[in-house]
Amino acid sequence: LCPSSYQVGQDTLSYVAAMAKVTEQINFLAAVRCGELHPPMLARTISTLDHMLKGRLTINIISSDLPGVKLSSSERYARSREVIEILKQSWTQDRIEFNGKYYQLSLSTDPVKPYQQNGGPLLYFGGYSPDGVDLCAEHCDVYLMWPETEQKLQGLMDDMTNRASDFERLVQFGLRVHVIVRETEKE
């Protein structure tokens, strides 16, 4: 997971672009806060990065507030849903035809399609609220979870599997943990 733009700071997509030239094998999980960039521009940027990385790009969908803009949890997930649907249209179709609450678009898609010809980079998503879980079940590829008890993780995985099956989809699972490695225990 690349430096996240969850807090205003380093731009994750710029960081990934810089790392593309100095790496050959590592895959990058770039956090993208939905609503920060106009979705057609975001689709083009991600497609370009995917080519630079020769398919080593994955995207972590973030549904947080934007600086100076406060939305309810359900509104943030609704905005993320619209962004994802526009990304997918941009990556797989010749036109974007979208009429949502946050975006109304009718335009040709960018000629740059992702390097990954399976619909674009894998979309990762983490969140426990019902709106977030539904969004992941319908549109994302990997459900990220935090360390929990084995029983809670199994319950989350079972719930996601059931919700995804309602959309005739399979979702993979990931566990986000932070590992601190030092020479000694004291460090």
Give residue spans per PLM region.
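Active-site-adjacent structural elements that line small-molecule/cofactor binding pockets in enzymes
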Residues: 1-187
